[in-house]
Regions:
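Bacterial Sec-dependent N-terminal signal peptides
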Residues: 23-43, 114-116
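Short, solvent-exposed loop/linker segments at the N-terminal edge
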Residues: 48-54
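Low-complexity "stalk/linker" and mucin-like segments enriched in Ser/Thr/Pro/Ala/Gly
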Residues: 74-89
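Short, exposed coil/turn segments at beta-strand boundaries within extracellular/luminal domains
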Residues: 106-113
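Mobile, glycine-rich extracellular loop/lid and propeptide segments
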Residues: 121-418, 424-456, 462-486, 512-530, ...
Length: 661
């Protein structure tokens, strides 16, 4: 017997692929007698994957090719060069799509093997929930399909260690040049005031750079630390430890791919000697190095005229200690938008929005305050970033606070214009008729984030926005006329919000998150605080009624069998346009301490977007904890890009994708 059993060979050349086939055959044996050889077979590895840089390595093995004829290579897109009997260089096409490479045996043309690859034109996930409308959809995902996202083919690939809890959504950039080489990069920031850049694909994890936002090169001064936030040494909050054990970077940063800037807000303190000195700074980091751009960070400071909580005379100033930079940052029209709420409702606090010139952070920001002559009205939205329409109008919701419909806007949805004369002019608002009741029971409308929906082509109301808060009511609003306030007291005597497009009371048990939109459907991740009961992930259709007006279905079109306890999920959707939709959510209920559900790993779930009752996969299914994630952080959102899913946890960034085959 003669063996020719060799390992598959493959190496990348430039932007192309080297594919190799190793012939295996069984010759004569048993004293010269001839044995009928087994049939030819071809194996191609890997059989699935994704290409962004147009370069990947494949290998083919041909069993029982006694004459060594090799294979014929073909593809549904792209080109081959340097073809030999068992090797070829493949260059993927520059256009996005899904492509199949086939190796066909020359000895038996009925035998072959194929590999399916996607070429994505996704440039990056630069902002919270994927886009300025906050739809949470990535429509340029070609590798992750419902048929591939199974326990057999999808799972945890690797983890990247970090120095603190990751409350931010990881951000992803394609084909970034670092140290002379192009690579995909995933960025994460921690509550220890660190920012990391990792190779998004390298296994084991490869750190490209780390920025310590408290060192002198990033504007820090001697003795600065992240702010202690739990236990007897807490310097913010009321002792609940909602952000535990420290506060550093909380709001999701935002990336400007044109300038190569990574905008992030840090929080820190010099605790001794007393009284403590608190800092919040806006940084613009270089994507390639982590170094400061624009001559370093700027200390955040602002004031407005007002006599509200914490004011001095007739001036209300920004307080770096009490204001919690909870929402994600936003970038629009050359301005970086930042919003704040409180630490555990610790007085005094207000809702602040500042807009900085993205090219010159030293210029005074434009300012808006939600309650300048009252109190509260924080902007937190369970980590959501403010939403924008294509005209540059900004939308966000506030929490409990003073309300009068004039200059105090607790439990309201606000529409602001871009910077003008140092301010952010208020254009419109909506406040539920039961605002006073919501405020009395801590029923923040602003526990959820706003989503700007695609504009329908029919109906009276064609510029729509959706919002949910703690009480689980879904509000569908006309962005051109949000509806303001329908007073329950005489003479209006309002018992509901009849002035808006649609209201669905008790549609969810409650929501601490933001819905996602895809292909005529909205996905809501409900929950109920306290941990004793929760809610399913629910889908509501968004379509035209008989009059042509686009509305939500009055009941879910599908829902998950799994029930999510507090804090509930914010869904993200991956799809190839209108096909292969997958809804991704994190079960962060074990985000403690403190939590009624204890401490434990976050669980990543994947659902068929056309039927949420069909769960495709979750990270708790595989044997031997193969896909186990790090411990949970509440309100976090998965990032889906280039065939991978990135999840921030308390100690690591976990990376999921198609398993080697």
């Amino acid at each position: 017997m003669r063996d020719c059993v060799r390992g598959p060979k493959a190496r990348a050349i430039g932007r192309g692929l080297i594919l190799s086939a190793c012939p295996l055959f069984l010759g004569s044996c048993n004293n010269g007698s001839t044995q009928t050889p087994p049939p030819v077979s071809v194996t191609l590895t890997p059989a699935r994957g994704l290409v962004v840089t147009q370069s990947i390595t494949l290998a083919a093995s041909v069993a029982n090719d006694s004459q060594g004829l090799g294979v014929t290579w073909s593809a549904t897109g792209g080109a081959f060069t340097n073809q030999a009997a068992t090797t070829a260089v493949y260059t993927a096409p520059p256009t996005a799509g899904t492509f199949t490479i086939t190796a066909t045996s020359k000895a038996d043309t009925t035998k072959g093997a194929s590999a399916t690859f996607g070429v994505t034109d996704l440039a990056g996930v630069f902002t919270w929930h994927n886009d300025l409308a906050r739809t949470g959809q990535n429509l340029q995902e070609f590798a992750l399909t419902p048929s591939f996202v199974t326990t057999a083919m999808f799972g945890k690939l690797f983890s990247c260690a970090v120095d603190g809890a990751v409350y931010v959504q990881p951000l992803w950039v394609a084909n970034l040049t670092l140290n002379g080489a192009k690579r995909n990069v995933i960025f994460a920031a921690t509550q220890h005031d660190s920012v990391y850049a990792f190779d998004a694909d390298a296994n084991p994890c490869t750190m490209l750079w780390r920025a310590n936002l408290l060192d002198p090169a990033h504007g820090g001064t001697a003795g600065e630390t992240p702010v202690p936030s739990s236990g007897g040494g807490a310097l913010v909050g009321n002792g609940f430890g909602d952000i535990n054990p420290e506060v550093g970077v909380t709001g999701t940063p935002v990336i400007d791919p044109a300038s190569g800037a990574f905008y992030v807000v840090s929080k820190s303190v010099i605790a001794s000697p007393t009284p403590p000195v608190f800092f919040q700074r806006l940084h613009a980091l270089d994507l390639a190095t982590g170094n400061e751009k624009l001559s370093g960070p700027v200390a955040i400071a602002a004031s407005v005229a007002g006599t509200g909580d914490g004011s001095s005379g007739s001036t209300l100033s920004f307080d770096a200690q009490s204001q919690n930079q909870r929402p994600g940052l936003a970038l629009f029209g050359g301005n970086v938008y930042i919003a704040w709420a409180s630490h555990e409702d610790t007085f005094p606090y207000h809702g602040w929005v500042l807009a900085y010139n993205a090219a010159n952070l030293t210029l005074p920001p434009a300012v808006f305050n939600t309650t300048p002559n009252g109190g509260l009205g924080g902007i937190w939205m369970s980590a959501a970033a403010p939403a924008f329409d294509t005209s540059g109008n900004m939308y966000f919701a506030t929490g409990n606070g003073s309300f009068n419909g004039s200059d105090e806007f607790g439990d309201s949805i606000l529409k602001l214009e871009g910077p003008s004369g140092g301010t952010l002019p208020l254009l419109d608002y909506f406040t539920p008729f039961n605002q006073a009741s919501l405020s009395a029971i801590d029923g923040d409308l602003g526990a959820g984030g706003s989503v700007v929906l695609p504009d329908p082509t029919t109906g009276t109301h064609r510029q729509l926005l959706v919002q949910v808060g703690k009480d689980g009511t879904i509000y569908l609003l006309d962005r051109s006329n949000l509806g303001k306030y329908c007073d329950p007291n005489p003479p209006s005597n309002c018992l509901s919000d009849t002035q808006i497009v649609q209201e669905l009371p008790n549609a969810l048990n409650g929501m601490w998150g933001t819905p996602a939109y895809w292909n005529g459907t909205l996905y809501f991740g409900g929950a109920q605080i306290g941990g004793t009961s929760g809610d399913s992930l629910k889908a509501f259709s968004f379509s035209a009624d008989a009059s042509g007006q686009f509305l939500l279905s009055t009941s879910p079109t599908s829902m998950s069998l799994h029930v999510f306890n507090f804090s509930g999920p914010t869904p993200s959707v991956s799809a190839n346009g209108t096909s292969n939709g997958i809804v991704w959510v994190l079960d962060n209920s074990q985000y403690g301490p403190p939590t009624p559900n204890g401490s434990g790993p976050t669980v990543l779930h994947a659902y068929d977007a056309t039927n949420l009752a069909n769960e495709l996969w979750n990270s708790a299914q595989a044997a031997n904890n193969r896909d186990l994630a790090g411990n949970a952080v509440k309100f976090t959102v998965p990032t889906v890009a280039n065939g991978k899913v990135y999840v921030g946890t308390r100690t690591e960034l976990d990376v999921y994708g198609l398993l080697p085959n």
